[in-house]
Amino acid sequence: MFKKSFWFSFIPTVVWCFVILVGSFISTSGIPSIAVSDKLIHFLFYAIFAVLLYMPIRINTKRAYSFVLTCVIVFLTGFFLGSIIELVQHLVIDGRFGEYLDLLANTLGIVTALLICEILKRKSVL
């Protein structure tokens, strides 16, 4: 089915997912505030996540999935991850609040990254 190297190509994605989870669930008390908008951070973190998930699915397989299927997989995975994190923040984590605008920033980061990946693939850069 898939080669061992295919599964190893997901290691950066899993590590980045862990970074997102840790950053989303740690308490913000005692951490100095950043001058950058948190929505920009959400956008960038999920854009990076989308690229790291896109690459092994679309590029590193012999039978590359279609662009649409790859986008659906990446989008739904990222959207599900972001939704669950926002829900857990809202219901469980003290001092953290789930926000719809965070989820919107996550989604825009995913969509933007997918569009850039496909443009670069068509120009044979990726």
Where are these regions (language model features)?
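Bulky hydrophobic segments
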Residues: 1-103, 107-126
